[in-house]
A protein has these predicted regions:
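Mobile cap/lid helix-loop segments that gate and shape the active-site cleft of serine hydrolases
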Residues: 29-31, 36, 41, 151-153, ...
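Primarily recognizes the serine-hydrolase "nucleophile elbow" in alpha/beta-hydrolase
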Residues: 116-189
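Catalytic histidine-centered segment of alpha/beta-hydrolase-like enzymes
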Residues: 266-276
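Short beta-strand element of the alpha/beta-hydrolase
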Residues: 59-68
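Conserved alpha/beta-hydrolase "acid-adjacent" motif
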Residues: 237-243
Length: 294
């Protein structure tokens, strides 16, 4: 039977970024919720996102990737009036993105889905008072991995596509990734023991081994990559710190912008104090710099 500490780590990995930013119960002013907007379809099922607009939106938007262990769960968008209060209070439009979820879908599917979500948001940006050049992305754990994939592999749209969504770019302006896996090479056949110890993490990794490099953001950093902030605990055993230190080194070999914040004593998740004193301030300083109006 798994130990309580192992179960806690599993929960943090599978829950992703849910508790990453401290917040209290109500935004300063009522926010408008546009729920269950369909950004695509897969196997006859809808891919959905929620857009939450603060009363005094500043034009920038943050896509919150609802992903932990590459599982993407639905919850009432009203919950993000609580979890996302800090974003709304700073006048960011908050976009909750769900991708095709494990166990049915695997990592490459999730990557493709979040790319499409960015394209959709760009397509519909004017409808929601969003500047498409001021899109940030935030995610923890698997959501952090997907954030870095978006930051490093953004592409222009295909003007000739019959799918109007695909005519728009998948580029973002900035990303914030908490404890992200950055190098998935070897994860399909020989994942680290800490991953093998969590049975729920097996299904999302059951994909063609040849695709591992394509979903390893560390291999896709270029001068054109979006600014990336990584926040990682030095006691993380599930996704060790080297994932972010190696990513930082890859960024430093280019003219791309990156920063790594190491949280001393933190494992795969942060205490309320670490969230309030480190994660929140670093996140909003990053978005404040790279999502500001030009």
């Amino acid at each position: 039977m798994a130990s309580p500490s192992r179960l806690l780590v599993a929960c943090l990995f599978l829950c992703g970024s849910w508790a990453a930013i401290p917040s209290v119960l109500h935004a300063e002013e009522p926010a408008k919720i546009h729920a269950d907007l369909v950004y695509g379809h897969k196997d006859g099922m809808a891919l959905t996102l929620d857009i939450i607009q603060p009363a005094k939106a500043n034009g920038a938007a943050v896509l919150w990737l609802q992903s932990g262990g590459w599982y993407s769960s639905w919850t009432e968008p009203e919950n993000f009036l609580i979890a996302g209060k800090a974003y709304l209070d700073q006048h960011y439009t908050l976009i909750i993105v769900r991708h095709g979820s494990a166990p049915r879908y695997q990592v490459p599917d999730a990557v493709a889905d979040v790319r499409r979500a960015v394209r959709y948001v760009r397509w519909k940006a004017k409808d929601y008072g969003i500047d498409p050049e001021r899109l940030g992305v935030f995610g923890g754990s698997a959501g952090g991995h997907l954030t870095l994939m978006l930051a490093t592999t953004g592409e222009e749209g295909d003007a000739s596509s019959k799918d109007e969504v695909l005519r728009h770019s998948s580029r973002i302006a900035a990303g914030v990734a908490l404890y992200p896996p950055t190098d998935l090479r070897g994860f399909v056949k020989t994942p680290p023991q800490a991953i093998r110890d969590i049975p729920a993490l097996k299904p999302p990794l059951q994909f063609d081994e040849a695709l591992e490099p394509s979903v390893s953001p560390i291999l896709h950093v270029t001068d054109a990559s979006a600014p990336m902030l990584m926040i990682h605990g030095d006691k993380d055993e599930l996704v060790p710190l080297w994932h972010s230190t190696n990513m930082e080194a890859a960024i430093q070999k280019t003219t791309a912008i990156g920063k790594l914040v190491v949280v001393k004593g933190a494992a795969h998740g942060y205490s309320p104090e670490q969230q309030a004193e480190i994660v929140g301030p670093e996140t909003f300083a990053w978005f404040g710099e790279y999502l500001k109006a030009k």
